Regions:
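C-terminal cap/substrate-recognition region of VAO/PCMH-type FAD-linked oxidoreductases
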Residues: 108-117, 122-123
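Acidic-aromatic substrate-binding/catalytic surfaces of carbohydrate-active enzymes
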Residues: 121-134
């Protein structure tokens, strides 16, 4: 894998004939990520810094953060200066059954009545929502965010007129990451609550939003010839520039450059603080600040960078793999499972939307970091009478 990615990074051109094609810099970002996963921090830093300093899109535009956070998730602004490596989707292009559209997200829309009309899967957790709470300086509290639960509409009827949105200050990225009752949901109006949720008792009151299209885009940037309008032209972004910056910040921490890491994190946070990019007409209170003083030590820096990845990249498919490579999947996920199922943990209050069916759930270190390899594939790997593939530990 390293050899393939390095070859692509060394040999691909920076500009391509068509936007969206993988170029030298997309390959470099993926190569740097692979090195980071292997804890080759100095090597990862060299590659990721090159991408950060010199990288361009396939069209030749220098990588840069978009002015508005939410534009990263809008089909009208895809293949932007922040898009580094994205799976290209298109609709209404003559293909059969929307085959070139975003089928991978088709089940992950609000449940009935809203955008996509199906199927209410991939719901954000209460733990994630709580993580967006901030202190008086607009900073997150990685250790204590679950000491207070952000108010939700668990069990509140759709026709209730008494529910109000929580008034504690939160990072403005929350409402571009999570759909919650009473807050504008793109241009669909305020999220109506339970009527857009498949089963609150099973998975809570929140809806995904980053993969969702705008109402004004229906039939134009969604496929109009199939059973669901959830097949969209919104690319699936594997790596964006903010991710590159935070991976570089992580590598800087590991090689001892804490101040450079702080600078990079603050740049990401500064974009999120652009009030023009806040959800408009929201009843929520938004606040986000900068890390104005040096981090005390490497441990504090790691904690800040890791928390920033969670907030910036929430619901984009990175979190589990980050926890595994940091070596903290077992304690983090078991703490979460205790919290969400109402078991006593860290003196946190029992969540309003606790999951009783998770009462016996447990993450086993050394096993659950990886799926089992299908037995059929192991059987087919026989060479010279010996099976080449070996089953992952614990299965």
């Amino acid at each position: 894998i390293n050899a393939d990615l390095k070859f692509a990074y060394d040999n691909l051109a920076g500009t391509m004939s068509a936007k969206g094609r993988v170029n030298k810099w997309a390959a470099g970002a993926m190569y740097g990520k692979a090195l980071l996963f292997q804890k080759k921090f100095a090597e990862a830093r060299t590659v990721l810094k090159d991408v950060y300093d010199n990288g361009t899109t396939a069209a030749g535009a220098k990588y840069a953060l978009l002015a508005k956070y939410a534009d990263n998730f809008n089909a009208e602004t895809k293949n932007s200066t922040e898009s580094v490596f994205a799976v290209q989707y298109s609709v209404n292009d003559g293909s059969s059954g929307g085959d070139n559209g975003g089928w991978g997200e088709v089940l992950n829309f609000p449940y009935t009545g809203g955008p996509g009309t199906c199927c209410g899967f991939f719901q954000p957790s209460q733990d994630l929502v709580n993580a967006f709470q901030v202190d008086a300086n607009g900073l997150p509290d990685p250790d204590n965010y679950n000491k207070r639960e952000v108010t939700n509409d668990q069990g509140v009827p759709a026709n209730s007129t008494t529910y109000t949105v929580d008034q504690a200050e939160v990072d403005p990225r929350l409402d571009w990451t999570v759909g919650r009752r009473g807050v504008p949901y793109l241009d669909w109006g305020p999220h109506p609550g339970v009527s857009w949720i498949r089963d609150q008792a099973y998975a809570g009151p929140y809806a995904p939003i980053k993969n969702t299209y705008y109402k004004s885009q229906q039939g134009v940037l969604t496929d109009k010839a199939f059973w669901t309008s959830g097949v969209t032209a919104n690319n699936y972004t594997l790596i964006r520039f903010a991710d590159v910056m935070l991976m570089l910040a992580e590598a800087e921490v590991e090689v001892g450059s804490l101040e450079e890491a702080r600078r990079l994190v603050n740049l990401v946070r500064a974009r999120a603080a652009n009030t023009e990019g806040f959800v408009k007409n929201s009843p929520a209170k938004y606040k986000i600040g900068q890390y104005t003083t040096p981090w005390a030590d490497k441990t504090a820096a790691q904690k800040a960078v890791r928390m920033e990845r969670r907030l910036e990249l929430g619901m984009e498919g990175h979190r589990f793999f980050d926890l595994v490579r940091w070596g903290i999947a077992e304690p983090t996920l078991n703490t979460y499972l205790k919290y969400v199922s109402g078991r006593s943990v860290n003196s946190w209050p029992v969540p309003n939307n606790k999951r009783n069916f998770l009462i016996n759930a447990n993450f086993t270190a050394g096993k659950h970091e990886y799926f089992p390899i299908p037995q059929a594939q192991i059987d087919r790997s026989t060479s010279g009478g010996q099976r080449v593939l070996q089953q992952n530990h614990g299965y």
